[in-house]
Amino acid sequence: MTVNLRDLSRTIAEFAFLTALVCNSLLIYLTARRTKNITGAYKYMIILFALLGLIFSCTEMLARPFVHNFNASFVYFSLSNDLSEFKSLVQMLLVLYSGLYSSLISFVAVQFIYRYMVLVNANLLESWFTGWKLVFWVFYVIFFGFAWSASVYFCLFPDTYSYNYIRTEFKDVYNIGVDRVAIFILVAYEKHPSSEEYKLRPASVIMIAGTISILVIQYSIMLFCGASMHRQMNEKLKNFSPDNQRLQKQFFKTLLLQISVPTVLFHMPIFPVLLGPFFNFEISAESGIIYSLFSLYPPIDGLIIMTVVTDYRIALTELFLGSHSGAQVEVIPVEVVSILNFSLL
């Protein structure tokens, strides 16, 4: 039995949207009203990240992004039937979707910076994450989202050569003309009409270099902060009580999951899609299923926080079983208040 990847993509996206709607809404409610130890800037960061995840999932449902790899090209287009008559609108949704993806990754990097400062220097944390200075981090997230969106719009906007390159392939596979759908096209090489030589298309190189640079920047931040925190945390744990050591281990486990899950599910699979055209293999693949996996990230991140962090588990128990269920919120002692006052735990 042949699996229809487009139908499977739709099913995954719908499941992810409903899951994100439930998980992220619950996370926002618990963070705002139920948790006891999550305060300060990080409280708002969790809420904003959950909201951004919801917007990402909603945009995915409207745009229905899909990708097709064909020889020296990949095609980023929409499978949306509901908005098919509004081609320009769907194009903007595709651009927005790519930008939101970049913003989500950048937001995770900001959380790593925050947690790193929590352990290194509380005064440094106050200098960078209080008052109007929080606006800087908002612009940080927006900047990288805009940069990714701009690279898609300006570098992949189809021209005559790219249209003609994938026209027959697109018609054969999807039974629709490329002129009728919201579409962006990367063609790595262009054949010179007289010499028959293949030359790199500058716009394609700029797009790939730009998007990979964004990922490298965010991952460098996360890896540096994560490794530094791990080294310093081991030393600091010696002075903590057993309860606080357990809390710190939960904290570090959350970090590991937040960086490893998107790496395995989203970032590793996307590299063959992005770089494949530059190898100019003879290939025809409906690789858009990867974009459906992207939509799973918002609910997964929410589930990680709510299942790993004790404060959320207690809040969930009280919410569904009542306040007399026996769950108790741990009191953070004075010995670690300077560290945990601004942190997730």
Swiss-Prot record:
One of its GO terms (cellular component) is plasma membrane. Keywords: Cell membrane, G-protein coupled receptor, Glycoprotein, Membrane, Receptor, Transducer, Transmembrane, Transmembrane helix. The chain crosses the membrane at residues 12-32, 38-58, 93-113, 134-154, 205-225, 259-279, 289-309. Glycans are attached at residue 71. The gene is str-33. It comes from Caenorhabditis elegans. PANTHER family: SEVEN TM RECEPTOR, SEVEN TM RECEPTOR-RELATED. SUPFAM superfamilies: Family A G protein-coupled receptor-like. Residues 1-11, 59-92, 155-204, 280-288 are extracellular. This is G-protein coupled receptor str-33. Disruption phenotype: Locomotor defects with hypersinusoidal movement and frequent adoption of a spontaneous coiling state. Mutants also display a hyperactive egg-laying phenotype in which worms are unable to properly inhibit egg laying, laying early stage eggs which results in the retention of fewer eggs. Increased tph-1 expression in hermaphrodite-specific neurons (HSN). Detected in ALM and PLM mechanosensory neurons and head neurons. It is a multi-pass membrane protein. Its main location: membrane. Belongs to the nematode receptor-like protein str family. One of its GO terms (molecular function) is G protein-coupled receptor activity.
